Amino acid sequence: MTLVIGLTGGIASGKSTVANMLIEKGITVIDADIIAKQAVEKGMPAYRQIIDEFGEDILLSNGDIDRKKLGALVFTNEQKRLALNAIVHPAVRQEMLNRRDEAVANREAFVVLDIPLLFESKLESLVDKIIVVSVTKELQLERLMKRNQLTEEEAVSRIRSQMPLEEKTARADQVIDNSGTLEETKRQLDEIMNSWA
């Protein structure tokens, strides 16, 4: 039996670090962000729907969607954010299910669905167990500002657009505290995976 694991966390909590550690173990990790990027590429149904919804102002000169422009629109407008999610989420969900089912058919021991907005999108039913990657509020803010070159105000706004990390950790089967060293994070992950093997 394949154990389907949901991997989630707050923005800039280090979820990608944990996902890469799982990949190094030879575990299939299905990344919702990568699938979401592919879903809005030219020629995909969601691409056309986004232009119909948001207009051609959000396009770059080569016709690709300007992620920064679209991001700025949806992070400050709840209705626009919901409209975008209504277009992108169904396409992403279907592709994730296809890939999950493929891993199950291949009798893999584990398959991981890496979904940043697992709880917000109410996708818990797609997985058997949930790991939340957590970090202190101070570290989260610092990492996000540095990684995305954001002002403190912009970073706080992005963090607030998601479910609070404390709420996510309360709903997890396991929590990895990623406030320390990589070795400490890896040790926690190894313990979890060994207990589920």
Swiss-Prot record:
Q: Where is the signal peptide?
A: none
An example GO biological process term is:
coenzyme A biosynthetic process
Give its E.C. classification number.
Answer: 2.7.1.24
Its keywords, alphabetically, are: ATP-binding, Coenzyme A biosynthesis, Cytoplasm, Kinase, Nucleotide-binding, Transferase
Which CDD domains has this protein been placed in? DPCK (cd02022)
Q: Where is the DPCK domain?
A: 4-197
Record-linked Pfam families: CoaE
User: Which locations, inside or outside the cell, does it occupy?
Assistant: Cytoplasm
Q: Which residues cross the membrane?
A: none
Show the GO MF annotations.
ATP binding; dephospho-CoA kinase activity
Where is it found, in Gene Ontology cellular component terms? cytoplasm
Q: What class of enzyme is it?
A: transferase
Please verify whether the record's keywords include Kinase: yes
Q: Binding of ATP: at which residues?
A: 12-17
User: Is the Nucleotidyltransferase keyword given for this protein?
Assistant: no
Which reaction is the catalytic activity of this chain?
3'-dephospho-CoA + ATP = ADP + CoA + H(+)
Give the pathway: Cofactor biosynthesis; coenzyme A biosynthesis; CoA from (R)-pantothenate: step 5/5
Which NCBIfam families does this one have?
dephospho-CoA kinase
Function according to Swiss-Prot or TrEMBL:
Catalyzes the phosphorylation of the 3'-hydroxyl group of dephosphocoenzyme A to form coenzyme A.
The record's family statement is: Belongs to the CoaE family.
For this protein, the record's PANTHER family field holds: BIFUNCTIONAL COENZYME A SYNTHASE-RELATED, DEPHOSPHO-COA KINASE-RELATED
Task: Please report the name of this protein according to its UniProt entry.
Answer: Dephospho-CoA kinase
Protein source organism: Bacillus subtilis (strain 168)
Source gene? Answer: coaE
